[in-house]
Amino acid sequence: MKIAVTGKGGVGKTTFAATLARLYAAEGRPVLAADVDPDANLGLALGFDEETLDSIVPISKMRKLVEERTGATAGNQFYHLNPKVDDIPDKYGKVCNGVRLLVLGTVETGGGGCVCPEHVMLKRIINNLVLRREDVVILDMEAGLEHLGRGTTEGVDAFIVVIEPGARSVQTYKNVKRLASDLGVAQVKVVANKVRNEEDEEFIRSRIPAEDLLGMLHYNTEVIDADRQGKSPYDFSQTVTAEITKIKEKIDQNSNL
């Protein structure tokens, strides 16, 4: 199972991605969680300590590694489009609570048509994770839709779009569904977060097709408290973990995932 979790900034996608990863790891399944967000904080949500996280350099920032694998140098305009990457998750990933974390980062100067060495490297790594790893792979994507335009997540089993009860968030889901279709990804599901009341629930149900809605997560200050204390929501909030467990069960029931 290979899932890309996406959504607008601040909607709670990292909390969802990290807790989902912890739930699969608790079952004894091999889990790889890849942080593809420039504001990398998936590690904290997984339960890593700050000292370990401070020692991690995103793959996209490892200039020597990128040069070594792609052959790209300052004076060389040519580089390999198919670099060796199959050893990178095990060599550079860090493990905590049964989850292997791989911090990929992003190519800040990317854009829709970027074919720079760093982008080639990241796309190859994600492609390897999606097509060749036997692990449960959960990608915590950068906020927005740029990664869809670059085709970075091509080949995943599904996109899970985390949204809030609001028109702009719903529009993000619609845009992801349209762009995912262009990448050949048929499964686009929704998790509604920060739901406060019946009015919010009705708003979500009236705008998201029932077959696409995996579930709702209710607004919970324990998530904020966990973040303040640098703890994983999985370890801090039984309520949040229970709600995401129900969503996970629905994911598991879907044979296409």
Task: Tell me the role of every PLM-derived stretch.
Residues 2, 30, 101, 136-138, ...:
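Residue-level preference for the first positions of well-ordered beta-strands
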Residues 26-27, 117-216, 221-225:
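Conserved catalytic-core segment of NTP-binding enzymes
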Residues 75-143:
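Phosphate-binding/switch loop-helix module in NTP-utilizing enzymes
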Residues 227-239:
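C-terminal boundary of histidine-terminating zinc-finger modules
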Residues 243-257:
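C-terminal alpha-helix
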